[in-house]
Amino acid sequence: MIVPDLFVAHFREAAPYIRQMRGKTLVAGIDDRLLEGDTLNKFAADIGLLSQLGIRLVLIHGARHFLDRHAAAQGRTPHYCRGLRVTDETSLEQAQQFAGTVRSRFEAALCGSVSGFARAPSVPLVSGNFLTARPIGVIDGTDMEYAGVIRKTDTAALRFQLDAGNIVWLPPLGHSYSGKTFHLDMLQTAASVAVSLQAEKLVYLTLSDGISRPDGTLAVTLSAQEAQSLAEHAGGETRRLISSAVAALEGGVHRVQILNGAADGSLLQELFTRNGIGTSIAKEAFVSIRQAHSGDIPHIAALIRPLEEQGILLHRSREYLENHISEFSILEHDGNLYGCAALKTFAEADCGEIACLAVSPQAQDGGYGERLLAHIIDKARGIGISRLFALSTNTGEWFAERGFQTASEDELPETRRKDYRSNGRNSHILVRRLHR
C-alpha cells in the first residue's frame, strides 16, 4: 500500500531531478552478476522507466565473473595482469556466447516490464558494431591475447540511435579492422564511451554499496581528488573502479555514480533523490557557496517566503532583493539552491549583520546553515569587520550555540537601531566578536 503523503513528498523531491535528466545521456556499466533472476527483471523495469522519462541510455555489461565461474568449472585458473583479464580463445568464445544470452534475457525482461499496460509504448533496444578495438598486446611480459581496448567509438552512430529514442546495448566486445574480436574491460569501456558521448552521468552498477572510507563508512559524495586519495588505500578492483571514474570526469563527464545494483530501485534512488543511495563523484566539490546574482532572485524569494509568512524573517520585496542582491550568498548542492544568507555592512561602524539566513526544509539535516554562517564570517573578516550581529525572533538559541552573545540595541549601528525600533518585531540582538 502506498502512503499518499510519502508518495507526494517523494514525487515532489524527484521532480527537479527528472527535469534535469530529460534529454541527457546516461551510460551505465553493469556487473554481469546483476544480469540474472529477479535482479535482472527489476533492473530492466527501471531502465524502461528511465527511457520513457526521456533519458538517453547506453548500457555496457561485463563478463568477468561469468568467465571466472566457467574457468573454475573446467579446472582452469583465470589469469590477470594489472587487473585486466588475460583472454584466451576459449574465454573469448564463452564471452561471445554470454553476450548473446544475456542480451536475449534483458530484451525479454524489458518487454515484460511494460506488458501489463496495453497501450504502453515499446522500448527499443539496439546493438551494433559501435566499438572498434585493438589488442592490448603485452603487459609486464604477459601476452594479453584476446584482451582488447577501444580504438575508436562510432559516436555519430550512437547519437543517431539515442536521438531515435533507442536504448543502446553494448557487450564487452569490440572488433578490429582486421576482423578479429577482442574482450573489453567493462570499467574502461563504460568510461571511454561516456567521454565520447560527453554523457551527463556514468553509473557503475556493482554489488557493493559504493566507495568506503578507511573507517568503513560509505563515502556519499566525493570530489575527484578525494576519490583518488581513497584509491591509495583501496583494494585492486576498487582502485580500478575509481581510476575509471576519475578518467571519465577528466574527460568531461559531469558525474560518476557507484551503487549497489542488487538493491531494488537503487538506480532510481540515486538519480532522483537529493542524497542518493551510493557514492557520487564529481570533478569538484558537490556543495558550494557563491555570490548571488539577479538570476537567483526568484529562487531566493521562494526560499524565504515560508519563513516570512511564519514571521521568522522580515518580508523582503522583489525590489529589495534586486537592490541588495550583492549582499547575498547562496548555497548550492548539485546545482540546486538550498540556502542563502546576506551580509549587511554599515559605513559608520566596524560591524556587520548576518541577515536572511535560510535553508530549504528538504535540507535541514545537511549542516547547510553552519556552512552559510562560516562563509559569512569569513567574508566579514575579509573586509575588516570585527563584530557580527544577528537579529532573531526565534532562532536566538541557534546563534548562541555558535558563539553569539546577547546584546542591547545600543550596540547596533545608528541606522540599524532606527530600523530596529520602527519595525516593531522586538527581535533578540546577538553579537559575535570576530578574531582575525
From Swiss-Prot:
Q: Does the keyword Chaperone apply?
A: no
Q: Name one GO cellular component term.
A: cytoplasm
Q: Which reaction does it catalyse?
A: L-glutamate + acetyl-CoA = N-acetyl-L-glutamate + CoA + H(+)
What is the top EC class of this enzyme, as a single word? transferase
Q: Which UniProt keywords apply?
A: Acyltransferase, Amino-acid biosynthesis, Arginine biosynthesis, Cytoplasm, Transferase
Pathway-wise, it operates in: Amino-acid biosynthesis; L-arginine biosynthesis; N(2)-acetyl-L-ornithine from L-glutamate: step 1/4
- The keyword S-adenosyl-L-methionine is annotated on this UniProt entry: no
Q: Where in the cell is it found?
A: Cytoplasm
Q: Where is the N-acetyltransferase domain?
A: 287-436
GO annotation, biological process:
L-arginine biosynthetic process
Membrane-crossing residue ranges in chain numbering: none
> What EC number(s) are associated with this protein in UniProt?
2.3.1.1
Q: Which GO terms describe its molecular function?
A: L-glutamate N-acetyltransferase activity
Principal location listed in the UniProt entry: cytoplasm
Q: Which family does it belong to?
A: Belongs to the acetyltransferase family. ArgA subfamily.
Any miscellaneous information on file?
Answer: In bacteria which possess the bifunctional enzyme ornithine acetyltransferase/N-acetylglutamate synthase (ArgJ), ArgA fulfills an anaplerotic role.
Q: What is this protein called?
A: Amino-acid acetyltransferase
